[in-house]
């Protein structure tokens, strides 16, 4: 089950001493200790109920689901990711220790699915937020496909080189955001003749100084442009 091909791991001396490299030993030790963080937002996540059952029993791969990102090294994303959920997903990914991996499960996670059609609130692909190692298409994917994706990820882990992994982690730092808490104040609004309608301009186009406008107490009659 856990046997992987290591180029330097099979060489033995006449005294039955295994000679290998630190890189291969590190990869071998992580093969059976992938602890996933299950991030499900839609119907694809229901397939995990079958995967955890006795028929498929994904515990045999050493997968122990964790509820804390600081104890996980694999995150399984399943379901639609909305704009409101995007910062939470990025924060969970950043809280995971290195090395860490991502499996995108389902069409909604990979491309946004049918919910991304003419939708302003759906992220069209989780890879726009965090780097993805394995894509698992389907609506929803079967438990056998999930096991196959985990097997492919384990093969990738077994062939990793420490220098390449470190360089890849530095390149992916572009996904890091500075989490700083700001004092939330009244949001801006536009006063139309027909009534008060909230402005739909994306927050990325509004400077942070203009986005939060200080008012000690604001009533509905005091909202101006």
Swiss-Prot record:
Binds 1 [4Fe-4S] cluster. Belongs to the complex I 20 kDa subunit family. GO terms for biological process: aerobic respiration; electron transport coupled proton transport; photosynthesis, light reaction. Keywords: 4Fe-4S, Chloroplast, Iron, Iron-sulfur, Membrane, Metal-binding, NAD, NADP, Plastid, Plastoquinone, Quinone, Thylakoid, Translocase, Transport. Gene3D superfamilies: 3.40.50.12280. [4Fe-4S] cluster binds at residues 43-44, 108, 139. NDH shuttles electrons from NAD(P)H:plastoquinone, via FMN and iron-sulfur (Fe-S) centers, to quinones in the photosynthetic chain and possibly in a chloroplast respiratory chain. The immediate electron acceptor for the enzyme in this species is believed to be plastoquinone. Couples the redox reaction to proton translocation, and thus conserves the redox energy in a proton gradient. It comes from Nymphaea alba. It comes from the Eukaryota. It is a peripheral membrane protein. It is found in: Plastid, Chloroplast thylakoid membrane. Its EC number is 7.1.1.-. NCBIfam families: nuoB_fam, PRK06411.1. Signal peptide: none annotated. Its cofactor is [4Fe-4S] cluster. InterPro entries: NADH_UbQ_OxRdtase-like_20kDa (IPR006137), NADH_UQ_OxRdtase_20Kd_su (IPR006138). It catalyses: a plastoquinone + NADH + (n+1) H(+)(in) = a plastoquinol + NAD(+) + n H(+)(out); a plastoquinone + NADPH + (n+1) H(+)(in) = a plastoquinol + NADP(+) + n H(+)(out). NDH is composed of at least 16 different subunits, 5 of which are encoded in the nucleus. The keyword Translocase applies. This is NAD(P)H-quinone oxidoreductase subunit K, chloroplastic. One of its GO terms (molecular function) is iron ion binding. One of its GO terms (cellular component) is chloroplast thylakoid membrane.
């Amino acid at each position: 089950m856990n046997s992987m091909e290591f180029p330097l791991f099979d060489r033995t001396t006449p005294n039955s001493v295994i000679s290998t490299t630190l890189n291969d030993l590190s990869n071998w030790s992580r093969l059976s200790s992938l602890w996933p963080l299950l991030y499900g937002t839609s119907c694809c996540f229901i397939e995990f109920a079958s995967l955890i059952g006795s028929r498929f029993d994904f515990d045999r791969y050493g997968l122990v689901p964790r509820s804390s990102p600081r104890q996980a090294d694999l995150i399984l994303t399943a379901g639609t990711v909305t704009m409101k959920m995007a910062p939470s997903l990025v924060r969970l990914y950043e809280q995971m220790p290195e090395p860490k991996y991502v499996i995108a499960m389902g069409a909604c996670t990979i491309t946004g699915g049918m919910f991304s059609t003419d939708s302003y609130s759906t992220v069209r692909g989780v890879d726009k937020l965090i780097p993805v190692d394995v894509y698992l298409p389907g609506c929803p994917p079967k438990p056998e496909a999930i096991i196959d994706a985990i097997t492919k990820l384990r093969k990738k882990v077994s062939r990793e080189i420490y220098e390449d992994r470190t360089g890849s982690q530095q390149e992916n730092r572009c996904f890091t955001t500075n989490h700083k808490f700001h004092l939330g104040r009244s949001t801006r609004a536009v006063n139309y003749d027909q009534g008060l309608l909230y402005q739909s301009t994306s927050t990325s186009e509004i400077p942070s100084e203009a986005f939060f406008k200080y008012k000690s107490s604001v009533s509905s009659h005091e909202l101006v442009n």
